[in-house]
């Protein structure tokens, strides 16, 4: 059965999702691109540049069919959370973007994730829903990732790390073994987190220290 996949969102990240879908199509002919859908003003008629012709309207105007799925084409955790929650209310089915070899059997992964290539992971990992691993991200053994997190390019989650929800992990960040990250945090690029952080804070440096709140 064909899977008609829509991308909800706009700007550069939605376009990146489109090209990763094209990569997936090369090995799975059941995947078809339905078009771009806006969400509450995010994603509209000026956001898609050379892909503008694929914009088909707003989510609120679209009636989803049985074979239709959604990719959340937004990077920021707060926006992903909002789109994910709104679409769950109308029972939309979510599509996970993954270009690569089969994941190990011991990896548990939820719905609506984006695993941009290359994505490298070890074993006994749990990943929740609607996360973004935005290229060359490494996740180590026995790590747990919640929902709606963003991992910047070349970030590394080492073994036994626990991560909550709605965190923004910058490019080239290293989360060292057994550290614990709460909810709603922002970690600046190139930072190294040794023990972890609680909730709604902003961290930077090596070793990373709290430099403010993420409100």
Which residue ranges define each predicted feature?
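Structural signal for interior beta-strand "rungs" in well-ordered beta-sheet cores
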Residues: 96-211
């Amino acid at each position: 059965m064909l899977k008609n996949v829509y991308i909800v969102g706009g700007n550069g990240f939605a376009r990146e999702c489109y090209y990763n879908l094209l990569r997936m199509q090369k090995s799975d002919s059941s995947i078809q691109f339905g078009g771009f859908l806006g969400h509450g003003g995010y994603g509209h008629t000026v956001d898609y540049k050379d892909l503008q012709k694929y914009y088909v309207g707003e989510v609120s105007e679209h009636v989803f069919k049985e074979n239709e799925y959604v990719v959340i084409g937004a990077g920021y955790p707060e926006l992903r959370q909002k789109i994910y929650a709104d679409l769950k209310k109308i029972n939309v089915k979510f599509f996970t973007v993954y270009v690569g070899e089969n994941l190990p059997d011991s990896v548990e992964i939820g719905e609506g994730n984006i695993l941009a290539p290359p994505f490298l992971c070890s074993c006994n990992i749990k990943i929740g829903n609607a996360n973004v691993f935005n290229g060359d991200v490494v996740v180590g053994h026995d790590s747990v990732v919640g929902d709606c997190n963003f991992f910047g390019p070349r970030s590394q989650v080492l073994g036994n790390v626990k991560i909550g929800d709605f965190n923004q992990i910058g490019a080239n960040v290293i989360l060292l073994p057994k550290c614990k990250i709460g909810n709603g945090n922002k970690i600046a690029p190139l930072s190294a987190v040794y023990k972890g952080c609680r909730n709604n804070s902003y961290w930077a440096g090596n070793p990373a220290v709290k430099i403010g709140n993420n409100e």
